[in-house]
Amino acid sequence: MADEAPRKGSFSALVGRTNGLTKPAALAAAPAKPGGAGGSKKLVIKNFRDRPRLPDNYTQDTWRKLHEAVRAVQSSTSIRYNLEELYQAVENLCSHKVSPMLYKQLRQACEDHVQAQILPFREDSLDSVLFLKKINTCWQDHCRQMIMIRSIFLFLDRTYVLQNSTLPSIWDMGLELFRTHIISDKMVQSKTIDGILLLIERERSGEAVDRSLLRSLLGMLSDLQVYKDSFELKFLEETNCLYAAEGQRLMQEREVPEYLNHVSKRLEEEGDRVITYLDHSTQKPLIACVEKQLLGEHLTAILQKGLDHLLDENRVPDLAQMYQLFSRVRGGQQALLQHWSEYIKTFGTAIVINPEKDKDMVQDLLDFKDKVDHVIEVCFQKNERFVNLMKESFETFINKRPNKPAELIAKHVDSKLRAGNKEATDEELERTLDKIMILFRFIHGKDVFEAFYKKDLAKRLLVGKSASVDAEKSMLSKLKHECGAAFTSKLEGMFKDMELSKDIMVHFKQHMQNQSDSGPIDLTVNILTMGYWPTYTPMEVHLTPEMIKLQEVFKAFYLGKHSGRKLQWQTTLGHAVLKAEFKEGKKEFQVSLFQTLVLLMFNEGDGFSFEEIKMATGIEDSELRRTLQSLACGKARVLIKSPKGKEVEDGDKFIFNGEFKHKLFRIKINQIQMKETVEEQVSTTERVFQDRQYQIDAAIVRIMKMRKTLGHNLLVSELYNQLKFPVKPGDLKKRIESLIDRDYMERDKDNPNQYHYVA
């Protein structure tokens, strides 16, 4: 290891010939380590020669050669020397430590040339486009020249310049000189920027311009690092002014769809400018400027002027474009949301609030819901905010008219589930029921729906008018899923009653087969649990002896199996099939029990007065008039009324129509008494209100029993949380007063707004 130090010293001498890529001083020979046997040894390199000395004037002569080549490049003339020879000359100079001088001389040569280029641009006679072309040519020439010069002086660039961080590369030096002596000249810069802005303005006006010229010049400004300060700020300022004026003008002149198309076109054009010739950094502020001036400043005006019309006309592409554009602007979606909600509430209220439109209300609501759903899906990209606000808006307007929408939705379900409905398939019926359930969710007074739905369901079940048992069960399942088992328990009980009645009738018919005198009447009885079914007003009528006898037989049979129960006959729900003989032949009539009692009288005589029929049947006055109307004034006129007329009056006479003709064998005579009258509607609604009072009373007592003492406001708040139907504060106050009167609770003697539970 004693010879390590001399090896280092000799190696530094070798490195001294490495063309300046490494600094020899950094590798100076280290002193020999102590401990050797005598002095340090030297490593001798055979055939080592000292660096040859340059001839006198070599540096000056070589620079003249290089300077001549530089001038040739700058003047675009041929170079007398080949590039390899010039490159080697630069390498030789750098190897002999004249790099600083060489760099300085090269910079001066380039600077002299660039300074000479400014003179032609100071002529005032050039128009803007010619000026831009001239400055672009100058820039292109300068770039080409600097590339060539750099290739000649590449060794200098990669050694001396690279090792000196304070020096710009030859290329950067060229950019700096061009920026300093040409583009930074106030007149040149002003004409260049103004010319570029003029070309862009012309292009925005629809003229064709030289885009490659713009791309080159803006690239020059970017390369020279003056793009943002000298061009972009002024460009954005002019853009802002242009689109501010354009937005104001076009909002006055154009309809909203046309205006939105123009905005989309402008945004596309500006985006294309960024791609084609503007610097990428300009994209964000440029697009933001267009959006602000053409959209942001006019959001409310656009919506007020055009949204309602687009929605009324179902202009789906235009609405999609509006959503897409408004989503680009801060506050745009929120503004669209608010107007969207107002439109839904206004349009929906017009459907719900007008009694003249009650006939078509539910179908109109379903169609409107389909329409807004389609708009949300296709135009608003299923945006959850639009979906949720649509639901809130539907809930708001549909409850502006209490009770009626709930009633009509129940009737609409009835029309779909009744036999003879026009739904083509089970799948279509199922889809319709799903849509109806969506409307049902929006209703606050679901108890009103339940009351009318139950009444109509009873008719369908008792008269056998259901289109499909599966559809009925499906609807029941939907209601149960939506409102819970408590809501549908009575409805499910109605179905159970019908199934149990079928079993009972099977056993009853078997029982009757064993009887010696079963009679001519085939009786079918439905046993209904009173708590499940709607409340029916009982009517005592005079049945025929055969009917009374059969009733007693069934009563004995049923109570024999179910002792302790009580049967109450509901004559208003009875119906029958009657056989009749006419001159033209035999017919069968599907009629109500009241119609049956009237027609059976004509087995005893050919004609009776209104008063005689009333006395014989015991049917209540108004019900009898409707019954006789159906038999004598309808399409199937089994009776002839005298005098003729549509209304049944006191003293009218009725005779049997022996000449009756009809193309069908079995004829169904409209059961007018089963059609809902105004009185029935009022009665159903009143029962709902009565039930609500009971529920309010029960809730108040339940709360007070638990809390013992409670303030008025807290009690009302608790009630709102517990009750599942809308209720007014005044109604709650009345129920509280009623309970105080009935000693369920009492007021505090010192604080009238405080209540105490009375055990």
From Swiss-Prot:
Associated pathway: Protein modification; protein ubiquitination
GO cellular component: Cul4-RING E3 ubiquitin ligase complex; Cul4A-RING E3 ubiquitin ligase complex; cytoplasm; nucleoplasm; nucleus
Gene Ontology MF, one: ubiquitin protein ligase binding
SUPFAM superfamilies named in the record: Cullin homology domain (SSF75632), Cullin repeat-like (SSF74788), Winged helix' DNA-binding domain (SSF46785)
Covalent link (Glycyl lysine isopeptide (Lys-Gly) (interchain with G-Cter in NEDD8)) residue numbers: K705
Modified positions (Phosphoserine) in chain numbering: S10
Functional summary from the UniProt entry: Core component of multiple cullin-RING-based E3 ubiquitin-protein ligase complexes which mediate the ubiquitination of target proteins. As a scaffold protein may contribute to catalysis through positioning of the substrate and the ubiquitin-conjugating enzyme. The E3 ubiquitin-protein ligase activity of the complex is dependent on the neddylation of the cullin subunit and is inhibited by the association of the deneddylated cullin subunit with TIP120A/CAND1. The functional specificity of the E3 ubiquitin-protein ligase complex depends on the variable substrate recognition component.
Family the entry assigns: Belongs to the cullin family.
Name the record gives this protein: Cullin-4A
